[in-house]
Amino acid sequence: MRVKDPSKDLPEKGKRNKRPLLPHDEDSSDDIAVGLTCQHVSYAVSVNHVKKAVAESLWSVCSECLKERRFCDGQPVLPADVWLCLKCGLQGCGKNSESQHSLRHFKSSGTESHCVVISLSTWVIWCYECNEKLSTHCNKKVLAQIVDFLQKHAFKTQTGAFSRIIKLCEEKREAGEIKKGKKGCTVPSVKGITNLGNTCFFNAVIQNLAQTYILFELMNEIKEDGTKFKISLSSAPQLEPLVVELSSPGPLTSALFLFLHSMKEAEKGPLSPKVLFNQLCQKAPRFKGFQQQDSQELLHHLLDAVRTEETKRIQASILKAFNNPTTKTADDETRKKVKAYGKEGVKMNFIDRIFIGELTSTVMCEECANISTMKDPFIDISLPIIEERVSKPVLLGKMSKCRSLQETDQDHNKGTVTVGNAHQPRASRKHSSPNDKNQLSHDRKHLRKWPSEEEKTVVTHPKNDNLEASPPASTLSTEASLNESLTDGSERDASLESSVDADSEASEPEIASKQPVLLRSRGDSCGHAEQHPHLPLASELPQAKETHGGEEEMAEAIAELHLSGTVTGNRDFHREKQPLNVPNNLCFSEGKHTRLHSAQNAFQTLSQSYVTTSKECSVQSCLYQFTSMELLMGNNKLLCEDCTEKRRKCHKETSSAEKKAGGVYTNARKQLLISAVPAILILHLKRFHQAGLSLRKVNRHVDFPLTLDLAPFCAATCKNISVGEKVLYGLYGIVEHSGSMRGGHYTAYVKVRVPSRKLSECITGRKTAAGLKEPDGELGGHWVHVSDTYVQVVPESRALSAQAYLLFYERIL
């Protein structure tokens, strides 16, 4: 039995039951009074329309703000205060927001009243006509019924469920295009990419590759195991086309394709690039450790590694078609066929078809007027930025011998004629010797290229810096299987570029070789040389030293069946190198070495030269400087073998030792022009260079156009282009570097647009679906700024004001 605690009183039930009911609060009483007097509820509320609209739209998202496609951290940047129209169910931001879409909807409703709205966060009902709050008690149970439905719907809706956002945007955009007669043309979306730790350099490049629509299209064609691949031989029409079955793509290629595919899916938010980045780190270990890296180096390693995988894939399929021949089983006829098909097949990999161009270096001896050209492939063009500073005057006395030639040939282009010695880095001039007479200007290093197989003939010995060139690939013997002749170019480059920014000018002022060499091909980290009887130049030797890192791999490859040596032509760009001896009777393939007899045609461009203005700093002015004519004199003189041979003939009585040492160095002119344009043009603005013992960044703004005409910088012999024809490119991607050398951040500006049908037809060689119409002139679209997971639509002017580091242009046909 419990005893009552005298300190506690039992509740008095009677008194509690008799207590009068009080209103919840004063506000609710006011709401009732106001609601009872509102005359708009009866015809400004529709339960059926609201239920239908809520079921078809995203919850608590302003539909108008959604059309602007503003995102942050992969989620839409939308106002928290969203109001729903109780007449039609439209959701818009409140009157306290910046856009006030809900209020605008009410004002633009016309004759039909849309004045009653409800806040989806506070459940406050408001009448724009009365400018007062309403209560759910007015007009019987209509408002109470709607509020109850909306609250239940909000409870069922998961917070942060924005998976349908981009999908709805694309459906609306596609519906609008169908009305305009553009059915089937969809605008890809833009998603943020998670930063794994100092991987903004990677994210910015991937964002631009994701907007390179032709890349995904070509990868999609050959993504599966067993894909049919047809190889036709234009050089050997007597051989029938070969149809091979490709194996599965390599791990990096597969990871890249899957990631680009995920970037196009509408159901996902920010993506994690962990799988793709890990695959790249396996090919290029230098990117491990989540350290700050360079975007351009990342781009080259990525494309090079993917190209290596595709090359091996194509070569393996060709060997499989011939039952995997070996040294013992393959006869001469089989070897010739494998080499012929391999040479043409490797050129069909999608990296070469999209990104690779060709640059021609033309050098003319001023004494004998002999002209020679050398063609180098490139993946991008690195352009130095001219800083606003007063230059030291050049001693004109050293130029007296070339002044008349400069004035006659370049009268309309005076500013482009440069003296090679004047542009030589200070460090190079300091360490140069009298034997450096054949040293080229360091501007030769401004182009980043992939060498063709016939050019990969340099072996550098660190002790004596001798260069040895190999015979043409056609003279090489066949020893083992084709797929064993390849090495991983990406891993080799990782060791070459692990300590220095390969694309900054910091790597340029290196000590020049003291021994003359034959010829150095263009390139920064993938240096190769070929013997060139008319252009023995020495300044490129420091770059050639970089090839020593892969010498052991090359020696092993040569010991096997060397079929890769002949699977390349002028547009073939293997990264492997073959350390072979130089025969005295070395023959050169047609196209690699050409004698020209007309100086006027040698330096002719497709159109008139670009005219720069005072203090101009633009992409055009940088290209103008890059392709301007140089005078090779002083320590940069040309060792002309024609002049040397003529002098030897005049002194037949001299000894053989004197003949060997009696080289003739002459003044020469040199110019670089583009001889084959790529489908996708990548320009690299060299913002990082060496200042003393440290690196510094050039922060000067460089103007870049939306539409670039490349014709003034192309040779008159440019492939598939007639003289006078324009070579137009449209800007679609920017990689921006903000900050300094010690701490910076990479972001991307990409143009979301309709894929170019004409460019696709040109590269793939087939017609697209009939009835598709492509807009005349520039394709429409909008610019998006992407900083890791932050995505925001920006005006075109903001994109053009970016501090560009990489520029992506696509060909306009």
UniProtKB/Swiss-Prot annotation:
Q: Which organism is it from?
A: Mus musculus (Mouse)
Q: Where does Zn(2+) 1 bind?
A: C38, H40, C127, C130
- Residues bearing the modification Phosphoserine: S28, S29, S507, S525
- Gene Ontology MF term list: cysteine-type deubiquitinase activity; zinc ion binding
User: What is one cellular component GO term in this UniProt entry?
Assistant: nucleoplasm
Q: What is catalyzed by this enzyme?
A: Thiol-dependent hydrolysis of ester, thioester, amide, peptide and isopeptide bonds formed by the C-terminal Gly of ubiquitin (a 76-residue protein attached to proteins as an intracellular targeting signal)
Show the coiled coil region(s). none
The USP domain covers 191-812
Q: Which InterPro entries match?
A: Papain-like_cys_pep_sf, Peptidase_C19_UCH, Ub_carboxyl-term_hydrolase, USP_CS, USP_dom, Znf_RING/FYVE/PHD, Znf_UBP
Under what name is this protein listed? Ubiquitin carboxyl-terminal hydrolase 45
In the UniProt record, the signal sequence range is none
